[in-house]
């Protein structure tokens, strides 16, 4: 038995992975007092959303994850897979759109897949959930902590703005699906 709030909601869950670039960001690792270096900051986003599934499609997904720290020989990167309860690239359920947005920001070090038990559950309850792989802050690419200090909140704001743009873009799967004015941050 699970506590009441941990049970699944009424919606089936879809999941997609997308890549976005935050242009002209300060590269704090390679900048110095004489020169500010800019770069286009890559971010991988995992997006869970209420979905419509055809009869033969199940909420089954396999996530590829990495644990460890690429720069620490005592904690080598170890790849593994785990199953989740979502359907990859499923059609979105538009019956109750727009859905509130939740942005998930992992710790240092971490990954966008750390809280799938929560992100899938929230999507089943009628939320669009976007989890960010923060560059320089994941198991796979952890770098100096000053990058995390500078970029974490900037990533969160950039992602909020990107999701809002996608909600107005008729070519996006998020078109009219998400209400970015009703957003929570975890």
Model-derived features: where do they sit?
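Short substrate-entry loop that stabilizes the transition state in hydrolases
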Residues: 83-141
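Short, solvent-exposed loop/turn and secondary-structure capping segments
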Residues: 30, 57-61, 113-118, 140-144
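Domain-level recognition of soluble alpha/beta enzyme cores
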Residues: 1-102
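Short, surface-exposed linear patches
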Residues: 39-42, 66-71, 125-128, 133, ...
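Hydrophobic aliphatic residue packing
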Residues: 13, 102, 128-132, 159, ...
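Alpha/beta-hydrolase active-site loop
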Residues: 114, 118-124, 145-186
């Amino acid at each position: 038995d699970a506590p009441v709030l941990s049970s699944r909601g009424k919606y089936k869950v879809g999941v997609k992975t997308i890549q976005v670039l935050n242009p002209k960001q300060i590269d704090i690792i390679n900048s110095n007092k004489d020169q500010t270096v800019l770069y286009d900051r890559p971010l991988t986003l995992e997006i869970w959303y209420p979905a419509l599934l055809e009869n033969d499609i199940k909420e089954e997904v396999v996530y590829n994850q990495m644990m460890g720290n690429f720069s620490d020989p005592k904690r080598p990167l170890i790849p593994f897979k785990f199953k989740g309860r979502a359907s990859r690239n499923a059609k979105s359920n538009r019956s109750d759109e727009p859905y509130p947005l939740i942005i998930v920001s992992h710790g240092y070090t971490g990954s966008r897949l750390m809280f799938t038990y929560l992100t899938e559950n929230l999507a089943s309850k009628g939320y669009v959930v976007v989890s960010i792989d923060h560059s320089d802050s994941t198991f796979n690419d952890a770098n100096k902590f000053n990058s995390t200090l500078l970029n974490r909140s900037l990533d969160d704001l950039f992602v909020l703005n990107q999701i809002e743009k996608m909600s107005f873009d008729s070519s996006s799967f998020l078109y009219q699906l998400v209400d970015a004015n009703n957003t929570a941050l975890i």
